[in-house]
């Protein structure tokens, strides 16, 4: 069953065509070289698996090797695998013993990876309830923090009370810092050194770098007492030496009292920026910070005037290494600076501090709750050359690609992460890396071991007889030749290294540039496009011309650069069919008799002919009409006149036959109307020589001649009749009009009433007119007499 599943796995890998070609074309000559091509490649160590010259064929996908005949037990194909060494279950609920708490699973494993391959791990993280907390309060005691010092005198009691609601195992400690006590950071006169505040006047302590005052303890009253006894100090410039203090608080694990199984919180309180890196060169301090603990017997930083300030990178390394979570509690003016620092430091948070630190308790509680609501992974160790990618699976199974952080988690919730590890190249050494949650001591230890070797390399036949009289060592199915020998079986000596016999011509490259010359013979390269062959590798089966993207039009085989067409095809591209079926028109004539069939398509030769079978030809007369002149001449002529019709028929390309016994197969029946309106019918046939013959000429349905006298009589009578009818109509219209006028006259005469005294037709001879131009004058009466 196991072998069957393994075979199925190999077959699955082999389904990718692109991958298959990559293995065989990689040019691998050894098993190790084959494995380096990619995780999909395998090597066949079986003896005589291929022709001795075909070493490259041993490297292929497992499926292809099986298909070529390689036995399964000879296939070298190491696969990536995960070996879990330690996988304790995650803790649930409260644990009495903090050493029994497990917050990450698994805890240890070995990862064996093929170069180029990837393996995905599942990592689970759960923050346990009631987890111990160590809080170290690191305070800036420069003169500007005097009011803050007074505010926190009872902080220990109040902080312990609030933290007891979140954990039953809480400890706190105290330390302070100011600045490096060297010029130009402080004044160096004896008075200023003894009392940096003498100019105020006010007494304060001499400037110091860092003092560890109270180790971590659960005695809150002791914390209050220590804070009450603190006095401020002073320096000149605004930035402080806080990063020196952070470094010492992080690395002095024994002095501070950090526990292994607890949450380490470092509360950094200041109202100013901090020096870092090469700022100390202003004071002539040039020795880089070594990241080690330098607290003397008085718990003071003894190398403050010797070592440079730590860089941000050094702080990150030591904070992560010692699982210290940094809480910046700074004033409004400094928030933006420390937010930039926090973006670089894993697990760091920033809180806004009031001028007198009045909100420090709420700030610490809020920062603690924020830290406990987040789960973020960090990677430590030798990761150079490794490719790691993360996918976070947070609340309700929500996926976050390329993220290794879950937010808004509750204590007791489980955050899962998919971690994909990839080695792009083969390495001879193993890698030890650590994947851990930020701020927690729990970690996953991961040993990454490259799988670059083949098992068959362990079995070596030195000076093997399989390698031509012991000229090499036989390993993994191939020979590794001794110096001075070469060839698949080490059969070639230095005297056989000439490549002249591998050249087709003296000026040609060896093996046409497409093969290797072994012992005077060409071993052609493999190609993803096909086979390369020939004594000089001069031939192949893929360099022929293409038609419509297909080699030899898909109708032939490519042989040494030339197309060999299959039956029924011809032409340079094998794209020309010899079949004429597609050229036959509906009447069964090839290209309708108007063209030639070329490569299965009609090429019309008659002017004006077109169509797939040249069936359309507006300028080509039909076969019947083209014979009209011949037929009409034959019917109308008699005796010697018929001889004249022979010439007309020759022009029409036809001959008239009087034979009645002829084959009507393939004949064309024609009907024409002659000049005498008679219907002429005849048949057109073609003899064996392709000549047109006209048979069975008949003239029928001739119309009778017209009766001209009767036509003339009819026309005359019709004209006479039309004239009589028109006269009658005119007479009727005139009579009707006269009667109407007489009736009208009679009606008007009956209505007339004449007066006896005056003739209505009489008009007087005198008319009176008024002069319209006369004004303001005596009225005159002008009588004008006008003759009517």
From Swiss-Prot:
It is a single-pass type I membrane protein. GO terms for cellular component: cell surface; external side of plasma membrane; focal adhesion; integrin alphav-beta6 complex; integrin complex; plasma membrane; receptor complex. Keywords: Amelogenesis imperfecta, Calcium, Cell adhesion, Cell junction, Cell membrane, Disease variant, Disulfide bond, EGF-like domain, Glycoprotein, Host cell receptor for virus entry, Host-virus interaction, Integrin, Magnesium, Membrane, Metal-binding, Receptor, Repeat, Signal, Transmembrane, Transmembrane helix. Residues 22-71 form the PSI domain. Residues 456-491, 492-538, 539-575, 576-615 form the I-EGF domain. Residues 731-758 are annotated as: Interaction with HAX1. The keyword Acetylation does not apply. Residues 1-21 form the signal peptide. Disulfide bonds join 23-41, 31-454, 34-59, 44-70, 197-204, 252-293, 394-406, 426-452, 456-476, 467-479, 481-490, 492-519, 502-517, 511-522, 524-537, 539-560, 544-558, 552-563, 565-574, 576-599, 583-597, 591-602, 604-614, 617-620, 624-670, 630-649, 633-645, 678-702. Residues 131-371 form the VWFA domain. Mg(2+) binds at residues 140, 142, 144, 240. Ca(2+) 2 binds at residues 179, 235, 237, 239-240. Heterodimer of an alpha and a beta subunit. Interacts with FLNB. Interacts with HAX1. ITGAV:ITGB6 interacts with FBN1. ITGAV:ITGB6 interacts with TGFB1. The VWFA domain (or beta I domain) contains three cation-binding sites: the ligand-associated metal ion-binding site (LIMBS or SyMBS), the metal ion-dependent adhesion site (MIDAS), and the adjacent MIDAS site (ADMIDAS). This domain is also part of the ligand-binding site. It is linked to Amelogenesis imperfecta 1H: A disorder characterized by defective enamel formation, resulting in hypoplastic and hypomineralized tooth enamel that may be rough, pitted, and/or discolored. This is Integrin beta-6. The gene is ITGB6.
């Amino acid at each position: 069953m196991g072998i069957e599943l393994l075979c199925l796995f190999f077959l699955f890998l082999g389904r990718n065509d692109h991958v298959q070609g990559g293995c065989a074309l990689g040019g691998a000559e050894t098993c190790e070289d084959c494995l380096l091509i990619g995780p999909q490649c395998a090597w066949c160590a079986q003896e005589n698996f291929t022709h001795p010259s075909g070493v490259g064929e041993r490297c292929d996908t497992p499926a292809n090797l099986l298909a070529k005949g390689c036995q399964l037990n000879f296939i070298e194909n190491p696969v990536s695998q995960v070996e879990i060494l330690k996988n304790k279950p995650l803790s649930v609920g409260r644990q009495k013993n903090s050493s029994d708490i497990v917050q990450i699973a698994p805890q240890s494993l070995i990862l064996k990876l093929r170069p180029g391959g990837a393996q995905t791990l599942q990592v689970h993280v759960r923050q346990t309830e009631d987890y111990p907390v160590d809080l170290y309060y690191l305070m800036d005691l420069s003169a500007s923090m005097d009011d803050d010092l007074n505010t926190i005198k009872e902080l220990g009691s109040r902080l312990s009370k609030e933290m007891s609601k979140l954990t039953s195992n809480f400890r706190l400690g105290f330390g302070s810092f100011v600045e490096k006590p060297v010029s130009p950071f402080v004044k160096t006169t004896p008075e200023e050194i003894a009392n940096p505040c003498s100019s105020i006047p006010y007494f304060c302590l001499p400037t110091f770098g860092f003092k560890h005052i109270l180790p971590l303890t659960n005695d809150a009253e002791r914390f209050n007492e220590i804070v009450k006894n603190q006095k401020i100090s002073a320096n000149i410039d605004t930035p402080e030496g806080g990063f020196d203090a952070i470094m010492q608080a992080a690395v002095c694990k024994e002095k501070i009292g950090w526990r292994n199984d607890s949450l380490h919180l470092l509360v950094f309180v200041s109202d100013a920026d901090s020096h870092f890196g090469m700022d100390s060169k202003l004071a002539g301090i040039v020795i880089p910070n070594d990241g080690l603990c330098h607290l003397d017997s008085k718990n003071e930083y003894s190398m403050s005037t010797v070592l440079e300030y730590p860089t941000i990178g050094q702080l990150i390394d030591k904070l992560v290494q010692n699982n210290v979570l940094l809480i910046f509690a700074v004033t409004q003016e400094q928030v933006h600076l420390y937010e930039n620092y926090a973006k670089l430091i894993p697990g760091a948070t920033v809180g806004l501090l009031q001028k007198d630190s009045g909100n420090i308790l709420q700030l610490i509680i809020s920062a603690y709750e924020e830290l406990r609501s987040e789960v973020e992974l960090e990677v430590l160790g030798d990761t150079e050359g490794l490719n790691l990618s993360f996918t976070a699976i947070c609340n309700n199974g929500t996926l976050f690609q390329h993220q290794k952080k879950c937010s808004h988690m509750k204590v007791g919730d489980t955050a899962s992460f998919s971690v994909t590890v990839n080695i792009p190249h083969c390495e001879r050494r193993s890698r030890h890396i650590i994947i851990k949650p930020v701020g927690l001591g729990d970690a996953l230890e991961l040993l990454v071991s490259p799988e670059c070797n083949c098992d068959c390399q362990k079995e070596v036949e030195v000076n093997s007889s399989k390698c031509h009289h012991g000229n090499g060592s036989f390993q993994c199915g191939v020979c590794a030749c001794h110096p001075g020998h070469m060839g698949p079986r080490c059969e070639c000596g230095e005297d056989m290294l000439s490549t002249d016999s591998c050249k087709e011509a003296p000026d040609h490259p060896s093996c046409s540039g497409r093969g290797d010359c072994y012992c005077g013979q060409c071993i052609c390269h493999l190609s993803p496009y096909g086979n390369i062959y020939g004594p000089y590798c001069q031939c192949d089966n893929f360099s022929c011309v293409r038609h419509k993207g297909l080699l030899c039009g898909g109708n032939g085989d490519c042989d040494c650069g030339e197309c060999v067409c299959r039956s029924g095809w011809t032409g340079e591209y094998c794209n020309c069919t010899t079949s004429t079926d597609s050229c036959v028109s509906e009447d069964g004539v090839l290209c309708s008799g108007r063209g030639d069939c070329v490569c299965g398509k009609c090429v019309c030769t008659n002017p004006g002919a077109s169509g797939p079978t040249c069936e359309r030809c507006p300028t080509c007369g039909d076969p019947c009409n083209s014979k009209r002149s011949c037929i009409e001449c034959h019917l109308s002529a008699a005796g010697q006149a018929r001889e004249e019709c022979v010439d007309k028929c020759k022009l029409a390309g036809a001959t008239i036959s009087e034979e009645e016994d002829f084959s009507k197969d393939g004949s064309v029946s024609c009907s024409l109307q002659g000049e005498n309106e008679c219907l002429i019918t005849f048949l057109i046939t073609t003899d064996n020589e392709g000549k047109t013959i006209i048979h069975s000429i008949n003239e029928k349905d001739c119309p009778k001649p017209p009766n001209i006298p009767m036509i003339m009589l009819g026309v005359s009578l019709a004209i006479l009749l039309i004239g009589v009818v028109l006269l009658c109509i005119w007479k009727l219209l005139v009579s009707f009009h006269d009667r109407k006028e007489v009736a009208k006259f009679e009606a008007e005469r009956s209505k007339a009433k004449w007066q006896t005294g005056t003739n209505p037709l009489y008009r007087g001879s005198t008319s009176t007119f008024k002069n319209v131009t006369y004004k303001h004058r005596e009225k005159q009466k002008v009588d004008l007499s006008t003759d009517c």
